[in-house]
Amino acid sequence: MVNVAPTLLCVHAHPDDEALFTAGISSHYGDLGYRVVLITCTNGQLGLDDHGRPGSDPLHNVEVTRATRAAELQRAAIVAGFSRVVTLGYDDSGMRGWPQNDSPDAFMNADVGCVARTLAAVMDEVDVSVVVTYDENGFYGHPDHVTANVVTRAAMELAASPKRLYYPIAPKAVLEEFVAGAKAKGVFLPAWILEADHGVSDDTVSTTMDVRAFAKRKHQAIATHVSQVDNADLVTMDEELFTLLFGIEYYQLAWSRDVTSGDETDLFGGL
């Protein structure tokens, strides 16, 4: 009988989320020989365009942004250790309150059952053991992140192979220390950090992944999404600050098929 490598699946909303939130674990498990798969739900066409204009700007170039972000995603995924990338192609919904929220093609308006069936099919095809996506608040409230949680939870009920579901989270103490240090050094902080509701309590953390050995790779993955200049200061800030935020990844166990839990330093522990 041939032993098949365990599979990690990360479900993300936009191109660059895979670099910002989970590039540490994807690099770690990829280097261990695990199969690491990425599903990106939207094309990110409302991100910053080639002139740095957000999707809310009437002059924003949607077509250029869509193509640019697709290319950046493929390059960054390789850096971050993903062996396969699945893109669902839904439109970016934009931040809450943007007019694009009303588009029938926006991910937040997608049919949950339809998306869940697509995700479940991928989960079982790759025989996934561990799935990672955002918590119910989408980490910082973005509609597409919230929708990613909803459809992933629905897919877990349909798929036979997943054994665990984790959420990437930021402990309150870590986030506050980072934000204070960044502000003291004049670092521009993007919305996904400033609007993360001040982090979560320490007792929410079930698994702590020390990925400092992959900090440079995570830095490179973030930098690969060069069009998203709102993250530029994260790329240029000093190593100490970068490692404080990105050197340790924290996860909350949201669901487990078996009552047996893993250890506190391995998402696959005990499987």
Label each region the model flagged:
Residues M1-V126, A154, L158, F242, ...:
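Active-site rim/loop-helix segments in enzyme catalytic domains that contact anionic ligands
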Residues M1-L9, Q100-N101, D105, N109-L271:
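Metal-dependent de-N-acetylase/amidase catalytic core
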